[in-house]
């Protein structure tokens, strides 16, 4: 993961209580057990933990009983810049606005399906039909090429079928973000690069996505003001107003950058 992205808590999905319950039990129990064992000196504490999140860093310095008694499993925390910030600082990439980039989502990975059943193929096909419709509309509106960036673990051949009209790439996300006019995404730590470059961004949601997947994008909307588009709704854009909204939103990135990326 790219340090600097907002972390959020995954939760159980309605209709799949036991899957969510078992995940939460495992996650919470394991963490509390490690904290207990570290305070009993059965396992060693972490000497130093590097953070980009200034909110968490402030909490570790807050005066409360937990910190006063030194009950944390971490002895010391240190604020650092995100990986993306250091990369751009040391190696200035070629930056332009020649294309529209989509960071596509893997809808049925174990990260999501541990909370619910796999999404049916028909629903996924409908999702990609509406998504490509949006991409074509944006491409025509701004006269820009569409580039689809895939996660390294994604199925390249399958996604080529969904995006047969567009260029699909893998392992080239950063360089394509640098060349983007607009970046569309679902939930991806790779957008830290886009935030630092003050790129126009849109987070996508659809009815096939579960609440955890939707929350991933909504976090960036909440913390950085990024625009949301629901591809299941009627999409009518007036070019000048749409572009003005995207430009205005980029001015709100400073809070996120100063809080989570370059504290």
Predicted features, each with a name:
Residues 82, 144-197, 201:
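Donor nucleotide-activated moiety binding/catalytic core segment of transferases
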Residues 160-164, 189-262:
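Catalytic binding pocket for nucleotide-activated donors in carbohydrate/polymer assembly enzymes
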Residues 2-6, 81-85, 170-175, 206-211:
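Short, acidic/turn-prone active-site loops that include or flank metal/cofactor-
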Residues 1-89, 191:
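Active-site and donor-binding regions of nucleotide-sugar-utilizing enzymes
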Residues 102, 126-170, 217-224:
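Catalytic donor nucleotide-activated moiety binding site of glycosyltransferases and closely related
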Residues 108-130:
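A solvent-exposed, charged loop/short amphipathic helix patch at secondary-structure junctions
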Residues 86-110:
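Nucleotide-sugar donor-binding and catalytic loop/hinge architecture
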Residues 48, 99, 181-182:
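Structural motif
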